[in-house]
Structures are given as structure tokens and as C-alpha cells.
């Protein structure tokens, strides 16, 4: 459970940073990022969701570390994280 909390925290942090940097309110970006983070590879993040950003070597090392945390999650836990974030983002739409 500790790894999934860390993964969620880092994902939310990256989302906030990217959101502030672009000045966009882009929930789709975050969902794409999270989906790729949970079921894809770091390379897929760099080529897709983060493709327009300059990802430095330290950030790439952090993504590799996240991948090792993610690999330890059971598939049902990954799915539940996605469901939770969809719920949170959906509640923001209604606010």
C-alpha cells in the first residue's frame, strides 16, 4: 500500500506541475498520464503524454523508480487507483 500511495502522490504532483506550466485545465492530460504510468512504460510517457516537455535525466530516473513501484502493484489496485482519480476529477467538473 505504501508504494501505491507514493505512486499516487508523485502522479498528482506531476499533474499539478504540468498544469501550472501550461496554464491549462486539462483533465484529459492527467488521465492519459496516469493511464500510461499505470500500464505503460516510461518511454511511452516521454513519447506521448510528456512528449512536448523537456524531461531531464533526473525526472527520467524518477520515472524508472516509479515504474518499479508500479510493477509491484496488483492489477486490481492499479484499476482502483484509476477509478478513484476518475471519481475525483468528475467531482471537480461539478464544482
Curated annotation (Swiss-Prot):
GO cellular component: extracellular region
Origin: domain of life: Eukaryota
Keywords, ordered alphabetically: Secreted, Signal
Name assigned to this protein: Secretoglobin family 1C member 2
Gene name for this UniProt entry: SCGB1C2
Family indicated by similarity: Belongs to the secretoglobin family.
The keyword Signal belongs to this UniProt entry's keyword annotation: yes
Keyword Endoplasmic reticulum listed: no
Subcellular location: Secreted
Predominant subcellular localization, coarse grouping: secreted
Coiled coil regions, renumbered to chain: none
Pfam families: Uteroglobin
Signal peptide: 1-23
